[in-house]
């Protein structure tokens, strides 16, 4: 009984006999809180007072907790161990006056109305909420408050509800600061990612612009070659560059249209042989290989002049006017083709070095070609003059008379006879061109002949490209 601090007879007698009062027990007295806390045992008033004093609670607070039936404690009792260190002085005696005062305070506790205490302290009796949050944790909270190592406030003006509210606010403040920091970091990360994305997009657009610029340069460099190829494909389809009047004349006869188609096919084959000859010359092929290619190209020229003869019989004006050629080629045409003498002048600088014998042969060939061209030119002038005189002569009598009709028919018959000689002039001019090429091949070596044929092909190819560029020029 003395270890538990009880109030038995032996303890009372000891307290009465000893003037210093009873000695406090050094053991840890066990204070058992019964299930029904409204019943207070008088024998343990002193222990209850010591417990209330050590926990730092006011008497009315303890009464508030002990008398309120909303704290439905669990049936099992919780043992609270009183730490002897919470007594300031072990030698201090407890007087009977203190015991009486404590007993009176405990009796007053049992008479206090718990609802009135709650209203005085401004606490709303939200019984359901308190039971929900604090019913199960009441034992742990009481143990924490009675522990001497718990940092609790000793200010009597601050009750448990206020401390709980301050604790909850402290717990909520930390996540709020953490959330604010996380949001700030997320915002900075978002800005950095957006800036990086903008930089990548700008770099990608710059690369695309540079790539497009390089492609435009390459396409411009190859434009002349592409125009020539497009012209060749157009000729394969029978589409040729000409004015509307010339085009109508070209389509007037089946012979002219057939010749245009044959010429397009011949030009395609000719370009293939020229490319083959160029590749062989660049590869430094032997004379035998070059001779085979040169002979095939000369055979192509022979075939071309044969096709022109057939077309001249069908429509001599179509062949003579050069409607199957481009406008730039027609500008340099002479009797339906090129001038042999002018071509030899262009080749003189491409065939060097020449031996003395070769130079003499080229000069003689050029002079003979020039003389033949002059003779044919004079013949054409004479024919044109005679044809003009025939058409201009005639009677000036009244129209519709029998004499005028007969004169008209006579003039047309004479003009038709003279026009028949145009085919002869065209054939002689083509023979001169073919003979000039064949004679040049005999004067030059195989490798020189290959260079000459390549130079001729390049010359006419540039004329065709010039014509295409001229027609494609912007017009104001």
Curated annotation (Swiss-Prot):
GO terms for biological process: DNA-templated transcription. Residues 10-25 have a biased composition (Low complexity). Residues 135-144 have a biased composition (Polar residues). Residues 191-211 are annotated as: Basic motif. Residues 201-242 form a coiled coil. Residues 256-473 form the DOG1 domain. Keywords: Activator, Coiled coil, DNA-binding, Nucleus, Transcription, Transcription regulation. Residues 1-29, 133-159, 171-207 are annotated as: Disordered. GO terms for cellular component: nucleus. GO terms for molecular function: DNA-binding transcription factor activity; sequence-specific DNA binding. Transcriptional activator that binds specifically to the DNA sequence 5'-TGACG-3'. Recognizes ocs elements like the as-1 motif of the cauliflower mosaic virus 35S promoter. Binding to the as-1-like cis elements mediate auxin- and salicylic acid-inducible transcription. Binds to the hexamer motif 5'-ACGTCA-3' of histone gene promoters. Binds DNA as a dimer. This is Transcription factor HBP-1b(c1). It comes from Triticum aestivum (Wheat).
